[in-house]
Amino acid sequence: MNSAIIVFPGTNRERDMAKALTLVGGKAPQMVWHRDSALPAGLDLVVLPGGFSYGDYLRSGAMGARSPILDAVRRFAEAGGHVLGVCNGFQILTEAGLLPGALMRNRDLRFICRDVHLRVETIASPYTSAYGLGEVARVPVAHHDGNYFADDATLAQLADEDRVAFRYCAADGTVGEASTPNGSRDAIAGILSANRRVLGMMPHPENLVEPALGGIGGRALFQSIVESLS
């Protein structure tokens, strides 16, 4: 599987993402700078990693979505390419119009950095096929603007089209306000595009892929990608 990670000024999770992709897929991704105007040929996957692109000036993801490389990422996605956006990458995807909704300031107005539980809401995607439907996975979050918002019509469409990939939940899989760390509507932690080839999610699966790091809750996401795209 050939993959590339987009690196912006302020990105800080590109090496974690590269390690996870290499560990599970056996091949290191290419790093692509934000000022580039084209993606490498022959890619199967483009990743927008976490961090604070352009220092989160204006608002999280706003400047990243308007960087030179995003035109190429948009063309790649529109041509049916697979794109994964994690944390700041999810924010960029919504700002770029590749996913619906917006990521707002957390409910309590504080930066959140801790492990959370996610419930897998669909396995009909190249990002979740190695999970079990309804499986609960423990993964970290680290964000200030992770409160997913969309209007009622968009939320209904996401649900009707089975495009909610992950919801925040308690350890037993119960979904509710108490287990949603940032106030996201419908406890949404990750969503898919209409063609199911673009995934945006706030939690960081790349940080829990091997037991030595404290767990493997994120590993099945990378297994899904490798098995689906190789």
UniProtKB/Swiss-Prot annotation:
Any GO BP: 'de novo' IMP biosynthetic process
GO cellular component, one term: cytoplasm
GO molecular function: ATP binding; glutaminase activity; phosphoribosylformylglycinamidine synthase activity
Active site (record annotation): 87, 204, 206
Pathway: Purine metabolism; IMP biosynthesis via de novo pathway; 5-amino-1-(5-phospho-D-ribosyl)imidazole from N(2)-formyl-N(1)-(5-phospho-D-ribosyl)glycinamide: step 1/2
Pfam family, one: GATase_5
Endoplasmic reticulum recorded as keyword: no
SMART domains: GATase_5 (SM01211)
TM regions (residue ranges): none
Keywords: ATP-binding, Cytoplasm, Glutamine amidotransferase, Hydrolase, Ligase, Nucleotide-binding, Purine biosynthesis
Disulfide bonds: none
Keyword Lipid biosynthesis: no
Catalytic activity line of the entry: N(2)-formyl-N(1)-(5-phospho-beta-D-ribosyl)glycinamide + L-glutamine + ATP + H2O = 2-formamido-N(1)-(5-O-phospho-beta-D-ribosyl)acetamidine + L-glutamate + ADP + phosphate + H(+); L-glutamine + H2O = L-glutamate + NH4(+)
Compartments (UniProt record): Cytoplasm
Domain Glutamine amidotransferase type-1 residues, every copy: 3-230
Enzyme Commission number(s) of this protein: 6.3.5.3, 3.5.1.2
Role noted for this protein: Part of the phosphoribosylformylglycinamidine synthase complex involved in the purines biosynthetic pathway. Catalyzes the ATP-dependent conversion of formylglycinamide ribonucleotide (FGAR) and glutamine to yield formylglycinamidine ribonucleotide (FGAM) and glutamate. The FGAM synthase complex is composed of three subunits. PurQ produces an ammonia molecule by converting glutamine to glutamate. PurL transfers the ammonia molecule to FGAR to form FGAM in an ATP-dependent manner.
Subunit text: Part of the FGAM synthase complex composed of 1 PurL, 1 PurQ and 2 PurS subunits.
Protein name according to UniProt: Phosphoribosylformylglycinamidine synthase subunit PurQ
Organism: Rhodospirillum rubrum (strain ATCC 11170 / ATH 1.1.1 / DSM 467 / LMG 4362 / NCIMB 8255 / S1)
Lineage, uppermost ranks: Bacteria, Pseudomonadati, Pseudomonadota, Alphaproteobacteria, Rhodospirillales
